[in-house]
Amino acid sequence: MTTWRWLVLGSAIFLTACAGSPGRIKTPAVDATSTAWLSQGKGDWPSAHWWAALHDARLQAWIVRAQKHAPAMLVAAARLDEASAGSQLAKANRGASVALDSSVTRERFSANSYIPPPFGGQFYDDGELAANFHYDFDFWGQQRHALNAALGEVRARTYELQGQADWIAARVVSTYLSLQVLQQRIDLLQKRQKLQLALRDLQEQRVAAGLRAADTLSPVRQDLLHLTQDLQDAQAQRDQLTIDLQQWVDLPLTQLQVSPRPLPTLLQTVPSHLGLDLLARRSDLAAARARVEAAAERAKVARAAFYPDVNLTAFAGWSSLLLSRWIDQSSMTMGVAPAIHLPIFDAGRLRAHLDQAKAALVSADASYREVLLRAIREVETAQVQAAAAAQQRAQLALRLAQAQRHGARLMQRQAAGLSDARAVLDNQLEQSSLIELDEHWLQEQLLAQVAMVEALGGGFAVTESPCCAGKATQRKSHDR
């Protein structure tokens, strides 16, 4: 057969192998239309260490400890190390491989086989020493796309590790603020209890003096019982929150006693350009997007499998049946073996693999959009809750101011002998009740502010670095 016929035959086989190749794989575009109708503000994005604005060194130490010792952080760091190792493997697969092989075999050749006597029926030593070289040519980008997919998984795991650290910080801050508010509520309930006891004693004196009927004591005593129950419930809730905090920071309960102090103020507001910027400010969105890109790269790997695989193998060394002449020049052997693999009759399996990769890409894109909708919902929910708490506290401030003015007039009337102590005690109890209600809405406001910070990403921002070492990233995240 002439040379040109060989070329025609080779071209025909090549085209046959590629005839069933699929179309191009496109990475789904970022869809930010659902963020366009988010309300805009004039604030800034949270800083990386937003909890430092609380000016509480003890709280900051607890956050660092929780991020360092939380099992979830260790799991996320291990997954990042696993992904980093996978990217190193994908990178290594793109290079050539060189191996040195050596073997010595003592063998008796059969006298009745293809080697006749006098060699047949005798023992001989077979020595082999060779350097082997192998390289796969990446003409269709299969290895490149596999590396990109592995790097995409590294990015996703990196974002998840950073997001886990931010999530733990938000949990510790929320628990700590709830403890602070609850401690103030307990102090307030104890003061109300003293007022209620004074009111009961006054009522008992009036009943004893015949100024009031005996049945008027029942409501006062009932109010005192309810107040005592509320105090016990608040103390039990405080103990439970302390246990929750212990689970995060891994310290003895004796070291977690929260002393009353002025409550901090978080003034996180909605930033400007909220819509599109939100995509780069949340770790879960960044991780989901990285997985979409990785899935697209894996689909391209499956697509490249439809094309011929070209590789080159070479070897050089010594081979001899006599060990005494093993490394003689006459025992040298070498060779070059270019090879091509044409997937002509494998289209069914390749197509199934490609369809599976495409389905994984669709699933990853749907998961990304689901995370995006959840992020939008969390931002809106935090806005509504913060606004509702602020409105409630504003109304309570008006009611408390009115009650305080009325209380001042009652005290003046009492000093002038125009009123008794019962009216003053009732007013003080009313003021205490309003303050307690304000404490409740203060807690809701603080938790809504923390939720707002968390919904806005907790200080996370996408970096341009495509990959980083797992262990280095683990140490960096733990040191935050």
Regions from the PLM with identified roles:
Residues 143, 152, 159-274, 385, ...:
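Periplasmic alpha-helical coiled-coil/stalk elements that build and connect Gram-negative outer-membrane
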Residues 2-68, 151, 235-280, 322, ...:
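Terminal intrinsically disordered/low-complexity segments used for targeting and assembly
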Residues 312, 340, 357, 364, ...:
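Hydrophobic, well-ordered secondary-structure elements that form the walls
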Residues 78, 82-85:
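Membrane-embedded segments
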Residues 14-17, 195, 340-341:
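Hydrophobic membrane-targeting signal helices
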Residues 49, 55, 62, 77, ...:
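Small/polar-residue-enriched beta-strand and adjacent coil segments characteristic
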